[in-house]
Each structure stands twice: as C-alpha cells, then as structure tokens.
C-alpha cells in the first residue's frame, strides 16, 4: 500500500472535478480525500495499491468533461493515514 499526495492545476474548481475524482477513486477502491485549495488548485490524498494509484493518476490527468488539467504533481509516500473510504472535503 502506498499514499499519493497529488496537486492538480488548471480549470479544476467549479466544474465538478472533485466529484469526478471521488468517482475515479471509488472505481479503484482507493481511500483518502479531495479538496479545493485557496490558490485555485485541487489537492488529493489517495491510499491504495500502486497499480490502482497509477491508473488513478492517469484518470486525474485526463480530467472530467468540463475541467482542463494543465499540471499535476505527485508525491509518493509509504506512510499511510489509514483512511477507510474516499471523501470530498468541503471548506
């Protein structure tokens, strides 16, 4: 099991992107969360098997129908926070 912290740049707020991310995470049985940041980007913390996380990152790069991802950064960690499901964090 690994943890990925992902920062997504582009048109990713106000376009259903967090819901899209949650659906993609649920398809892969990943745990963690997604939230909007004050700087206009979206932050994701996802935990699960490496192959599922890699597939998830590809889906996030492609984005949802109304989003436009321009940049993505991924930080990998072996320390897990022990999430049991994937959720949207509302601020």
From Swiss-Prot:
A GO molecular-function annotation: acylphosphatase activity
The protein's name in its UniProt record: Acylphosphatase
Catalytic residues (UniProt): 18, 36
EC number: 3.6.1.7
Family assignment from sequence similarity: Belongs to the acylphosphatase family.
Record-annotated Acylphosphatase-like domain positions: 3-90
Domain of life, per lineage: Bacteria
Reactions catalysed: an acyl phosphate + H2O = a carboxylate + phosphate + H(+)
Originating organism: Bacillus subtilis (strain 168)
Keyword Electron transport: no
Signal peptide interval: none
Keywords attached to this entry: Hydrolase
pH dependence: Optimum pH is 5.3.
Keyword Amino-acid biosynthesis (UniProt): no
